C-alpha cells in the first residue's frame, strides 16, 4: 500500500487526511508535518482509523512513497528538491512557486534524474484537460479571470503594497492585470490556478491574468478563455470558499483527492 506523508495540515491537507481515513483513498496515511506541531497533532487526533506519526521533514521524506505538499510556496522551494533527491514522488499544491524558472527547471530535472513523479492537481478550475489537448496543436492565447469576494484577497502582497482598502470596496473592482508570472507573486495564496494553467499551456509569460474583487460575491469565480489552432473554448467555475480559509476554494481540495485516487487507479480516464 502506498505510504503518504502530508506536509501542511491546513484545510486541503486535512481534507486529504479525512479522505484516506474514511477509505475513499486506498493508501496509508503514514506521517504528518506542519510548522505548527499542535495543528498536526490536532489533525491526527481528529481521525478515526488512521494514526499518522508526526515527523520532521527529513524523517518524513525518508519514510514515505509520496509526499503531498499543501503548505506554501516557500515549502515547495525547500522541501520538494529534498524529496526528489531522496527518490520520493511529490504532489505539489502550492504550484505558484513554479513561476520561478530556475526552480521549475531544477525540479523537473531532479524528477527525471531520480525517476520520480511530480503531480500537479487541476485545483480550483476546470479545463486543464482541454488546455493539455489544445497544446498539441498550438495555443495562441490563454486568459484567466479570477473574481473573489474581498475577504478572499485580504493580506495578498499586491493588496498590501498598493494600500488597497478592500473592506471599503462597494462595487466590482479590477485589482490586477498582468502575466501569470506576475500574478502568482502578487497573489501567492489566491491564484495558484494561474500557475497550473501556465504549466499545461503556453507558459507563465504568455498566460494573462486578471484579478477582480467583488463585494457582491460569496463564491470564488475562475473563468478561462483559450484560443488556438484547435478553435477556442471558455470554462467557468463558481467555487464555494473553504469554510476554514476563504482564500482556498473547496474544489481545490477535491481536486487533490481526485489526483491521489487517479494515481492509485489502474484505469485512467480523460486526458
Swiss-Prot record:
Its EC number is 1.4.1.21. It catalyses: L-aspartate + NADP(+) + H2O = oxaloacetate + NH4(+) + NADPH + H(+); L-aspartate + NAD(+) + H2O = oxaloacetate + NH4(+) + NADH + H(+). The keyword Iron does not apply. Signal peptide: none annotated. The active site is at 222. Keywords: NAD, NADP, Oxidoreductase, Pyridine nucleotide biosynthesis. One of its GO terms (biological process) is NAD biosynthetic process. The keyword Secreted does not apply. NAD(+) binds at residues 124, 192. Coiled coil: none annotated. Specifically catalyzes the NAD or NADP-dependent dehydrogenation of L-aspartate to iminoaspartate. The iminoaspartate product is unstable in aqueous solution and can decompose to oxaloacetate and ammonia. This is L-aspartate dehydrogenase.
